[in-house]
Amino acid sequence: IDINNGENIFTANCSACHAGGNNVIMPEKTLKKDALADNKMVSVNAITYQVTNGKNAMPAFGSRLAETDIEDVANFVLTQSDKGWD
């Protein structure tokens, strides 16, 4: 697990829609801790699955990112949600 790599992957691939843990497409589906819990996205496996396969307006990144990069970004998201995206 490489949180720094996860941050770099997030910045390059996710921040256009999810900067600061927000969601510009679906404002209620943020990456904040309470929203992740409401949407059952509180594990690396759940986030990894969604990043890999996509859902609704979110594209699938499984063919664009390495599995280890997806795991790193999932760990980064969970770490940031615990810290409040400061």
From Swiss-Prot:
Cellular component terms (Gene Ontology): chloroplast thylakoid lumen
Pfam family, one: Cytochrome_CBB3
Annotated PROSITE patterns: CYTC
One BP term from GO: photosynthesis
Keywords: Chloroplast, Electron transport, Heme, Iron, Metal-binding, Photosynthesis, Plastid, Thylakoid, Transport
GO molecular function: electron transfer activity; heme binding; iron ion binding
Post-translational modification: Binds 1 heme c group covalently per subunit.
Subcellular localization(s) per the UniProt record: Plastid, Chloroplast thylakoid lumen
Keyword Metal-binding belongs to the record: yes
Gene3D superfamilies: Cytochrome c-like domain
Keyword Chloroplast: yes
Entry binding sites for heme c: 14, 17-18, 58
Domain of life of the native organism: Eukaryota
SUBUNIT field: Monomer.
Record-stated family: Belongs to the cytochrome c family. PetJ subfamily.
Primary role: Functions as an electron carrier between membrane-bound cytochrome b6-f and photosystem I in oxygenic photosynthesis.
Designated name of the protein: Cytochrome c6
